[in-house]
Every structure is written in structure tokens, then in C-alpha cells.
Amino acid sequence: VEHGYVAGLMAGNALATHDLEGSMFHTALGQDIYTQKSHPNGHYNHLDVINRVRRSGSIAQFIEDYNIDNGIMYSCVKNNVPFVLTGSIRDDGPLPEVIGDAYAGQTAMRGMVKKATTVICLATMLHTIATGNMTPSYRVLEDGTVRPVFLYTVDADEFVVNKLLDRGSLAATTIVTNVQDFIMIVAKGLGIL
């Protein structure tokens, strides 16, 4: 995001919530991100974050109110990268920007993918399948050039990446690996690490 390689982000309430939890408390579901030590009552941290974001009124205002200076959502806000957060029936909260109506969420996602030239889906099965099903295989640029849209799915579970292929997204390239390793290798390849 910081280096301009992300033009849009599509995710669920969980990615944004846990990213903001990590930014604010340095925990993920109450465990320290780096040491994995549990914090006392840390399992409430994500709920505390949701309530603070809701009190602030938006993710951007929360970032300003609490001087958040790291994380995916921080980088999206700082760099004006649009994001679409869609909800699930089992979401905590959710955060203010989360679209709870499935059809409105799909419409917002379609609006983002129709502008894409490359789509990379990272370790979220339901969003990956939804995105794959709505991503066109080509795009016509303003000058009339027809350009393919590249679609990659990355997950440590081959069942997840193959599920998209099983549903007819034949243009998808699947990569079975740990997402963190994938991101680090790509970042090194781009020379940004």
C-alpha cells in the first residue's frame, strides 16, 4: 500500500478490525503479535477497537483520534486507497464502513474489480470466491486497447484456492503458500524491502 502497488482493497469486517487492533494494542485476538503472549482480558481488544471506531464515526476519524500510525487500514486512509468492507452474519460490531447488505456489498465490489488490471486474493475463501466470480477476464482501456485482467489466489490450503477454479474462474492462477511468505517474496522482488 505504502509503495503504490494497491489501488483498492476489498475485505470483510475482520481484516479491518484485527488490523486496527494490531495497530492500537499490538495484539491479534488478545495475543501479542510478536511474542504470542496473551494479554489479560486481551480477547476483548477487538471489541474495544470496534466500539472506539464506532464512537469516532469512521475508520479515518478513529485513526486521527487515536494517532494510529501503522497497519493496512492506516495505509489505505493515508494514501487515499479506496476500500470496500463487506459484512457477514457473524460479524462483531461491525465497523461503520462495513456494508451489511450483501447485494450492496457485491455492487461496491463489482465497481472496484471492473477497474482492476490485476487482482490478488489473499487467504479469505469467501471473498476470494466472490471476487473471482465477479472479476472480468479482460478490460477495455480508454484508448480501446483490450487488456487481460490477471487474477491470483494465495492461500496455505489448496482446497481454498482450488474452490475458485471449481466454480468456473478458469483465468485464476492459484498459489498454495503462506500469505506472509508470499507478501515478503513479492516485496523483495519489487525491491521495496
Question: Model-predicted segments: where are they?
Answer:
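Metabolite-binding pocket within alpha/beta catalytic cores that recognizes anionic/polar moieties
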Residues: 1-56
